[in-house]
Amino acid sequence: MKRYILATVIASLVAAPAMALAAGNNILSVHILDQQTGKPAPGVEVVLEQKKDNGWTQLNTGHTDQDGRIKALWPEKAAAPGDYRVIFKTGQYFESKKLDTFFPEIPVEFHISKTNEHYHVPLLLSQYGYSTYRGS
């Protein structure tokens, strides 16, 4: 019985970090708000890429939910310090609303130095402008 309890405790300690990551401790999230409507921008494709010596490598992709968010954009692999970018594919979003836009894609480059922190990239969007910052 003692061995069973010990094995259960050890298994839960090993599985806890993976379960925590899957449960919402992903290090990267994004949020898009449409400044023209004051509402979230659902259905926007967002691509995560890592800078390598010879260019950019795609790590993950997702679409914003009804609240304009992707809560877990980091792939299921350990984070590493380095340069990354998220590319917001906004052209399709405006096309679906039958609106023109000057920015069909918005690449936002950022640097990860501490892999134990959370990085949030909000995008405030309109047809002819945008702003972004490191959120929380």
Swiss-Prot record:
Q: Where does substrate bind?
A: H31, R69, Y133
Q: What is its EC number?
A: 3.5.2.17
**Enzyme class, UniProt record, top EC level:** hydrolase
Q: Which GO terms describe its biological process?
A: purine nucleobase metabolic process
Q: Does the keyword rRNA-binding apply?
A: no
> Which domain of life does this protein belong to?
Bacteria
Please report which protein family the annotation says this sequence is part of.
Belongs to the transthyretin family. 5-hydroxyisourate hydrolase subfamily.
NCBIfam families according to UniProt: hdxy_isourate (TIGR02962), PRK15036.1 (NF011610)
- Which proteins does it associate with, and in what oligomeric form? Homotetramer.
Q: What is this protein called?
A: 5-hydroxyisourate hydrolase
What is the source species?
Answer: Salmonella typhimurium (strain LT2 / SGSC1412 / ATCC 700720)
* Record gene name: hiuH
